[in-house]
Swiss-Prot record:
Belongs to the 4HPPD family. One of its GO terms (molecular function) is 4-hydroxyphenylpyruvate dioxygenase activity. Signal peptide: none annotated. Its cofactor is Fe cation. GO terms for biological process: tyrosine catabolic process. Residues 6-134, 161-320 form the VOC domain. PROSITE patterns: VOC. InterPro entries: 4OHPhenylPyrv_dOase, 4OHPhenylPyrv_dOase_C, 4OHPhenylPyrv_dOase_N, Glyas_Bleomycin-R_OHBP_Dase, Glyas_Fos-R_dOase_dom, VOC. This is Putative protein C31H2.4. Binds 1 Fe cation per subunit. CDD domains: HPPD_C_like, HPPD_N_like. The keyword Iron applies.
């Protein structure tokens, strides 16, 4: 009681909602299905599987457009579903956590109650939704719309759900942020990666994975490490984003090879992984009894990362930054009886992003 049960949706603030919606539909298989238009803003709702994304743009200057100038297009809200909002609110009162906005909307489709919190140390908010028996298309005030016609007539790129989100923090602020999540949402620390793993000659980082009791909500927090001669990828994000924020979210898919092939055909670019990584992977796999149904040659060719244990494996791949600023990217992930988080790939991912930093000239 009094905890979150699932990611409901994420919301972007962008300069042009229609153009951004088209890009995410084109590259990542989303479809637009609902919209909310007011005198002040346009919001377009996208879906792929149960993953939901709202793309919002504003028509006049306000606090959100000021944040847009600061961050560029960015994820403003990571929303969660709760079963008992009253219990959550009581927990917030007990922990002296401020609710910045509450609403209760009753429509013919049912009752929706919300509470919005400002996260620790940044502009990201979390809206908590108690939906009960609500049977609407999406949320109150959103009306159904058709998808872009083009994407109704080309190959689909189906996702299952939104697997997790990752947020970056300035050096020294991650633990306070984690404590905020412990108190507000009753998340727990599941594992961590320190600067002995995510490290190079030039930079380092540390990260904590926070989960709810059922592991249906996974939030990773990351920060850079002091004392290195270069600038960590987390510090690069902080500089370009103008502070802490959501670095990426992950879409869970059933067939990552097919998904990546489709996305690459639509001009989505992914990080490249050295051949040595796959040589080592194949050697490690040869010493186990694990059966991998995917073609390892295709995994190598597509630059897909793999982590495994005695029970199963995980496949994951990371896009290059999706915007002019090297901030937001998207992860595609496939799980085969594997509940871990790709900890074995953290070093490979760290090195791949650092190589991109070096190309951009932002490592020093």
């Amino acid at each position: 009681m009094g905890s979150i049960s699932a990611i409901h949706h994420i919301e972007f603030i962008v300069s042009n909602a229609l153009q951004s919606a088209y890009w995410y539909c084109s590259g990542f298989g989303f479809e637009k299905f609902a919209e909310k238009i007011t005198d002040e803003s346009t919001s377009i709702a996208l879906r792929n599987g149960t993953a939901r994304v709202i793309i919002t743009s504003y028509n006049s200057q306000n606090i959100y457009t000021d944040q847009l100038i600061k961050h560029g297009d960015f994820i403003k809200d990571v929303s969660f579903r709760v079963d008992n909002l009253d219990a959550v609110l009581q927990n917030l009162v007990e922990n002296d956590i401020k609710v910045i906005q509450q609403s209760e909307v009753s429509t013919k489709d049912g009752l929706v109650r919300t509470a919005t919190l400002l996260s620790e140390g940044g502009d990201v908010t979390h809206t908590l939704f108690e939906l009960g028996e609500f049977k609407g298309n999406f949320l109150p005030f959103f009306t159904p719309i058709s998808n872009f016609e083009l994407f109704e007539n080309i190959e689909k790129m189906p996702a299952i759900l939104m697997d997790h989100v990752v947020q970056n923090y300035p050096i020294g602020e991650m633990e306070a942020a984690a404590d905020w999540y412990f108190k507000t949402m009753r998340l727990k620390r599941f594992w961590s990666v320190d600067d002995k793993v995510a490290t190079s000659e030039f930079s380092a980082m540390t990260a904590w994975l926070l989960v709810n009791d059922d592991h249906t909500v996974q939030v990773t927090l990351a920060e850079g490490v002091k004392g290195r001669k270069g600038k960590s990828q987390i510090e690069e994000f902080i500089n370009y984003h103008g502070g802490s924020g959501v670095q990426h979210f992950a879409l869970l898919v059933e067939d990552i090879i097919s998904a990546v092939q489709i996305m690459k055909s639509r001009s989505v670019e992914f990080l490249t992984i050295p051949s040595q990584y796959y040589d080592n992977l194949e050697e490690r796999l040869s010493k186990t009894n694990l059966i991998v149904k995917e073609d390892l040659k295709m995994i190598r060719e597509l630059n897909i990362l793999m982590d495994f244990d005695e029970n199963g494996y995980l496949l994951q791949i990371f896009s290059k930054p999706l915007q002019d600023r090297p901030t937001l990217f998207i992860e595609i992930i496939q799980r085969a009886n594997f509940k871990g988080f790709g900890a074995g790939n953290f070093k490979a991912l760290f090195d791949a992003v650092e190589r991109e930093q070096e190309k951009r000239g932002t490592l020093f």
